[in-house]
Amino acid sequence: MLTLLHLLSAVALLVWGTHIVRTGVMRVFGARLRTVLSRSVEKKPLAFCAGIGVTALVQSSNATTMLVTSFVAQDLVALAPALVIVLGADVGTALMARILTFDLSWLSPLLIFIGVIFFLGRKQSRAGQLGRVGIGLGLILLALELIVQAVTPITQANGVQVIFASLTGDILLDALIGAMFAIISYSSLAAVLLTATLTAAGIISFPVALCLVIGANLGSGLLAMLNNSAANAAARRVALGSLLFKLVGSLIILPFVHLLAETMGKLSLPKAELVIYFHVFYNLVRCLVMLPFVDPMARFCKTIIRDEPELDTQLRPKHLDVSALDTPTLALANAARETLRIGDAMEQMMEGLNKVMHGEPRQEKELRKLADDINVLYTAIKLYLARMPKEELAEEESRRWAEIIEMSLNLEQASDIVERMGSEIADKSLAARRAFSLDGLKELDALYEQLLSNLKLAMSVFFSGDVTSARRLRRSKHRFRILNRRYSHAHVDRLHQQNVQSIETSSLHLGLLGDMQRLNSLFCSVAYSVLEQPDEDEGRDEY
């Protein structure tokens, strides 16, 4: 029982080491890897090589698949190029299996020792994250060594020998058992290594080992499908395409397993080595053969998994990819893109408010809907950022994290103000049949145009962080405040002149001027985050 526990813990250590390498590489090179994948989709050979290269770095075809899946889910990459990258990822993980199964036992303690020094010494820096990668690689090599050590006494047990002796060559049964190995161990690499060790010990025959390897590859596809079962239709299509490619490859090669085993058995290599080499060449040949069929497979997957119909018209988060949370740069970019969507909705609210001011009361209902949409997006962004490992963020990432939270909150508060403004105009002006004076309406229009311009500039500053634009936004904020004050005095002058329309709408008019001032402050606050200096007049602003 203790020996079995050692084996399970070694497999768990292998999975954990792979996770550490993936998160470390993604935190250092995540944005670059994402760029490489997104730019490689134009040509199939380039996309295939990108899948191999990225998987070699992150030590996991599942990680590469998750990246590509997020692209497809956000409509950044078409399904066919995504499937090409996934095929490349399958080859990449097989090649890394060959490299990691060389005798590198001397390298494991060295990587762990150096990695710990760098990671603990400079945890938040690039060097610290590279140290994290070193620790992960060291743990992977250590886990592989422990698996071999743990399997040896297990294979000598009579009960185990009887169980594996039942694998007498039923190719479908053997392949299913291999798939179960991969799913249970959460790693096709662990399943392949276990198969190689059992073969070297003479517990299973070479043909059975080949079936187990084929099944392990199929199991990794099933694992990806299970991981994406709750994802949207676009993401599930990628996982389905990958699984179908592996299933087709398995069905093609399984009838020839005994012939392959007989041919490979003539090579003067240890059986365990042959199992690993078969794993590499099987994936390489399968993926190269499948490359010409990615377009038909993409069409087939779209037929099987159709887009879900929109059951409601409420705006939903689109860019908050949960798989990117371990990579701060990517997660922050996703949250920023979602904040830009709030900005777009805010712009629609401003346009709707202007229509209400000009006598279209039906737009007030649309304002309420947009305010609800913005609240949904803001809540999603807030919860998404709360799930990030904030204590591991670098200083620049922490600053950006705070900027996104502040900007999304300001826009959410602004939406509440605009919704209230629309309701008050509809109730106090339109329903009561009290129109603004011509001069008053012109002034409100001028402030509206300036406010809308400031909103657009603010979103640009938020996204780009451009200092010149931030200074321009700050100056524009001051000009708006001066203009607002001037129009407030002009309204009072009209009251002195006994303008009937101004008198009837006075409280509403002055209230709108105050609300617009608050909106302007909320929109323009992003300028100070970029400039990182307080404004001398900031204390006089209304928020």
Swiss-Prot record:
Pfam hit, one: Na_Pi_cotrans
- Tell me which domain of life the UniProt entry assigns to the organism this sequence originates from: Bacteria
Decide whether keyword Lipid metabolism is in the record. Answer: no
Which residues are in coiled coils?
none
Any GO BP annotation: sodium-dependent phosphate transport
- Fetch the InterPro entries from UniProt: Na/Pi_transpt, NaPi_cotrn-rel/YqeW-like, PhoU-like_sf
Catalyses which reaction(s): phosphate(in) = phosphate(out)
Q: Does the keyword Cell membrane apply?
A: yes
Q: How does the protein's chain sit in the membrane according to the entry?
A: Multi-pass membrane protein
User: Where does the record say this protein resides?
Assistant: Cell inner membrane
Q: Name one GO cellular component term.
A: plasma membrane
Annotated membrane-spanning segments are 1-21, 48-68, 76-96, 99-119, 134-154, 175-195, 196-216, 240-260, 274-294
Q: Which GO terms describe its molecular function?
A: phosphate transmembrane transporter activity; sodium:phosphate symporter activity
Keywords on record: Cell inner membrane, Cell membrane, Membrane, Phosphate transport, Transmembrane, Transmembrane helix, Transport
Output the PANTHER family linked to this UniProt entry.
Answer: PHOU DOMAIN-CONTAINING PROTEIN, SOLUTE CARRIER FAMILY 34 SODIUM PHOSPHATE , MEMBER 2-RELATED
Q: What does this protein do?
A: Might be involved in phosphate export. Overproduction of YjbB reduces the elevated levels of polyphosphate (polyP) in a phoU mutant that accumulates 1000-fold higher levels of polyP than the wild type, suggesting that YjbB exports excess intracellular phosphate (Pi) in the phoU mutant and thus reduces the levels of polyP.
NCBIfam families this protein is in?
2a58, Na_Pi_symport, NaPi_cotrn_rel
Q: Which family, according to UniProt?
A: Belongs to the YjbB family.
For this entry, the protein name equals: Putative inorganic phosphate export protein YjbB
